[in-house]
Curated annotation (Swiss-Prot):
Its main location: membrane. The lineage of its organism: Archaea, Methanobacteriati, Methanobacteriota, Methanomada group, Methanococci. InterPro entries: DUF116 (IPR002829). The chain crosses the membrane at residues 19-39, 50-70. It comes from Methanocaldococcus jannaschii (strain ATCC 43067 / DSM 2661 / JAL-1 / JCM 10045 / NBRC 100440). This is Uncharacterized protein MJ1141. It is a multi-pass membrane protein.
Amino acid sequence: MISILGLDGFLQLVGMITIAIFALAFISFILILIISYILLKKNKLIFPSLALFLMDNLYSILLKIFLLIGTEDTFYRVGIEFYNKYYEDRFKKAKKRVLILPHCLRDTKCPAKLTPKGVECIFCNRCRVGEIIKVAEEKGYKVYIVPGSTFLKRILKEEKPEAVFGVACNRDLFYGMNMLSRKGIPSQGQPLLRDGCINTLVDVDELITRLKSL
């Protein structure tokens, strides 16, 4: 073939074939992502162990690929849904659980004080955080209201929970669940409906329902 095409022609042909293979592989990967997302919405996982490895270790690459067909926020939501589905059964079996709530769920005039273990709710009824805490504690959760990820790392070190339920914005929740997954700790997450530094919002009724059912 080299004698027919010449060296330059042969190398050009090899280059074209290589590009075609990579393009086909890339398109196939995109299709797999789309199919996986559709199945995830139907509570089905394909190749769960492989998907977990990719999500845990290659999420930055997955994000770049996902941005070709979606948004960064959508990627985080998909990741959260994946972790929720993947770890649901293990989470239900865990005995020592903690619930992590963001301090931004509080009312702007919240009288509770920040302590070394987070914000200590005084159940003043200015917001629904107290309601969430009561339900969670009845279900055996130890609850923390935290101002940032530093507190989460401290809680993991001191409490050594078997499972963690987190409430946060999509980005923080995804990275938190990703970190927990790499540590082998099953988690569940409830994204905020409205994020920001103050006056954030979560679907309290849905959160309480999940806390009771898990």
